[in-house]
Amino acid sequence: MDPGDLDELCSHVNSKISLIKKTLQLRNIGQDPSLNSVLSKIAFEMHSLYNLLNNLETEVQRQETIANSLRELQATVERDFTEASHLKENIPPHLPKRTQSSSSAPDEAPEMVVKVAAPEPAKKPSKEKPIKEMELITVHEFGTVPAYMKNRLTYEQINNIIEELNKAVVGKYKILHQPLKSLSNQARKQLSRYKEEETKDTKGQFFIVDQDIKDFTQVKVDKRFHGMLSILRHCHRLREIRGKGLVRYIIC
């Protein structure tokens, strides 16, 4: 037999003998009446320690769950803060601004009420026929526009073009709504053209054509302009009706 194997066998036998001795010693201790109370106390402490470890493990798991929830909440708050900052930095100039009347003293309120209730401003709108205009797009709507449509166009540029097109709509339909006798020669020529451009598909609709845009605005009807129209169609602000060599932009 190899000397190394013999040494390993001897070490194994000695280890077993040592283990048997310790077992016999513990057995003898367990049979000693004077040590029974000590062993019982140790057993109780071991049981308490086991319960404590279980409670500790449960608490660790609970804290991990809370930590995960807090991380998710932090991500949500950071995202909302980023969106709010973007909205604050990109507030459209078209929105109404707060007037000083909101911070006026209480004794000024009766005067403000009298001005609002004045009969003349209340009667003026009823004398004019309403003209349908396009609503400005929201930041959310602009976010839904595909990137290939946007190209380098910005949210503000799209709302600016909406305002320009609304000028053309208002300018055209003010002429249409005026009595014929009150129109100038130029306005009468425009009125005649408006009538010729109407079709059965445009009945009851508000629409303009390229010539109206040239007459009432400084907008260039070019490739960039038609790119903006694609975004307005996507956002359901207008649609097109073609016929008789004209493209009619119907206000939605």
From Swiss-Prot:
One Gene Ontology biological process: mitotic sister chromatid segregation
Positions of the UniProt region annotated as Microtubule binding: 129-252
Localization (cell): Cytoplasm, Cytoskeleton, Spindle; Chromosome, Centromere, Kinetochore
Coiled-coil portions: 44-75
Pfam families, per database record: SKA1
UniProt keyword annotation of Nuclease present: no
Gene3D superfamilies registered for this protein in UniProt: 6.10.250.1370, Ska1 microtubule binding domain-like
Keyword line: Cell cycle, Cell division, Centromere, Chromosome, Coiled coil, Cytoplasm, Cytoskeleton, Kinetochore, Microtubule, Mitosis
Entries under InterPro entries matching the protein: SKA1 (IPR009829), SKA1_MBD_sf (IPR042031)
Region described as Disordered: spans on this chain: 84-111
Assembly and interaction partners: Component of the SKA complex, composed of ska1, ska2 and ska3.
Cited function: Component of the SKA complex, a microtubule plus end-binding complex of the outer kinetochore that stabilizes spindle microtubule-kinetochore attachments, promotes alignment of chromosomes at the mitotic spindle equator (chromosome congression) and assists suppression of the spindle assembly checkpoint. Kinetochores, consisting of a centromere-associated inner segment and a microtubule-contacting outer segment, play a crucial role in chromosome segregation by mediating the physical connection between centromeric DNA and spindle microtubules.
Descriptive protein name: SKA complex subunit 1
Organism: Xenopus tropicalis (Western clawed frog)
Name of the gene this protein is made from: ska1
